[in-house]
From Swiss-Prot:
Species in which this protein is naturally found: Candida glabrata (strain ATCC 2001 / BCRC 20586 / JCM 3761 / NBRC 0622 / NRRL Y-65 / CBS 138) (Yeast)
Record keyword Membrane present: yes
Cytoplasmic side: 210-245
Protein name: Increased recombination centers protein 22
Listed GO CC annotations: endoplasmic reticulum membrane
Signal peptide annotation: 1-20
Amino acid sequence: MKFLHIGLMTLMAGVSNVLAQEEANAEDVMVNIEGQDMTMEEAEAYMAAKEKMGGAQQQREMINLQVNYDLLEEPFADLQDFIVFEVGETATLNYTIHNLDQEETYSIVGVSGAVLSEVDQRNVANLTETNITEIVLAPNATGTLRHKIDMNLTEGRYYILPLLHVKDKNEVKRVMSNTFKLDLINQSISIFDPSFLSIIAVLIALVGGTVYLYSNVVAPPKKIKKKEAIPAKIDESWLPDVHKK
């Protein structure tokens, strides 16, 4: 009976280890969602984003556009990875949009988007909806567009979901392009930054004032001991006797 109990415990421990290993391996699995390689966690965020965007991706499939972009500030960055920016900086999406339709003409009339937290895929901010000068794309035509995104967020990792506003006949549809993965860090301080230089100036003034105060007020003046005068000895040998004392 004792050996049976030990055997069952060993079997259960083995099953637990296998399940734990499978779960760990699942986190490393890469999947391809609509042309993008993602981890399972990123795929879940992407699908949640599609739902939040109210079917914007489905509209992209209905509108036959090929939408690509690179980052003006980081032209050689791998957009499959998280791109590092500092809080307060601006990221510029440099779009290239190609109309693959053989018959329909589309117009790009605006941009907007959303920002999701990487942690829980919660919508933490929206990109400002901006109207632009209409870009008309005839069949097989290509157009370009720049979309500036201000990084006015707290430090952390985010999914940026840019949207193009596309006019199809008389209806404006929101078309979601590829997700931009952002790693936002706090600003580094430059030694030439005016605020940093002002802090240094204040510190120097404080140190100088403290030294002056201690030297002239707090510390007692040093007493200089006067040396006693030693009378000079005069050689009187050359004087006449009447003048000698």
